[in-house]
């Protein structure tokens, strides 16, 4: 017997269309975390991330035909829906939302070696500065950082998500890294480099 957890997204979608609720639950559990994380990194707000995540999967349930497997895998489609929903939320509030004061900081904490509280504090402060710097980026730069650096999405899938050329993703990411280095330098928090290695600590 093949359990739904072992099936690919396309087969799980086929089963879901046929009325298999468990198949949809597997899809949700597989993609909910990354979609929530992306929405949180884009908005800085846990409440927005919760709303966006719910809206993404409600949209998928309402109309499965919106996803065309011939145009790519399910993940870029879901990220694309999340991207549009985040933009709508931010347009409604008309300002960039800072991290909620009651955010669960444990969800962002890097894993550090025990026995070095000063080093841990310095690292936390640096990552906090990096996180805040990401939130100040223009949305078209912030989204490529979230997709390519934080979610480690390929340039091709990021291009499908955003709806632009791969070259545009590369140039935006390069520009975003330059802006982040400048912002961190201005805050006296310049890392040795900004890229996937430093970003992994935020996920």
Regions found by a protein language model. Give the residues of each.
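Helix-turn-helix DNA-binding module
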Residues: 7, 132-168, 182
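Structural recognition of an alpha-helix C-terminal capping motif at a helix-to-coil junction
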Residues: 51-58, 72-84
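Sigma70-family region 2
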Residues: 17-18, 44, 55-71, 92-94
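Internal acidic/polar
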Residues: 2-6, 96-123, 154, 196-203
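Arg/Lys-rich amphipathic alpha helix in sigma70-family domain 2
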Residues: 62-66, 80-101, 123, 175, ...
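Amphipathic, Lys/Arg- and hydrophobic-enriched alpha-helical face
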Residues: 28-46, 63, 134, 186
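N-terminal module of bacterial RNA polymerase sigma factors
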Residues: 1-34, 118, 182, 189, ...
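Short, charged helix-capping/linker segments at alpha-helix termini
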Residues: 1-3, 15-26, 37-55, 166
């Amino acid at each position: 017997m093949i359990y739904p957890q072992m099936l690919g997204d396309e087969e799980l979608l086929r089963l879901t269309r046929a009325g298999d609720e468990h198949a949809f639950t597997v899809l949700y559990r597989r993609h909910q975390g990354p979609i929530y994380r992306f929405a949180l990194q884009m908005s800085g707000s846990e409440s927005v991330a919760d709303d966006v995540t719910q809206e993404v999967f409600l949209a998928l349930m309402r109309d499965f035909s919106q996803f065309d497997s011939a145009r790519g895998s399910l993940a870029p489609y879901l990220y694309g829906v999340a991207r549009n929903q985040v933009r709508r939320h931010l347009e409604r509030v008309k300002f960039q939302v800072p991290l909620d004061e009651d955010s669960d900081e444990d969800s962002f904490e890097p894993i550090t070696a025990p026995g070095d509280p000063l080093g841990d504090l310095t690292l936390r402060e640096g990552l906090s500065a990096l996180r805040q710097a990401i939130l100040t980026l223009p949305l078209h730069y912030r989204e490529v950082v979230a997709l390519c650096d934080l979610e480690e999405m390929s340039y091709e899938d990021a291009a499908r998500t955003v709806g632009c050329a791969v070259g545009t993703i590369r140039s935006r990411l390069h520009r975003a890294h330059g802006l982040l280095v400048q912002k961190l330098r201005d805050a006296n928090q310049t890392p040795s480099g900004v890229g996937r290695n430093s970003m992994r600590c935020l996920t």
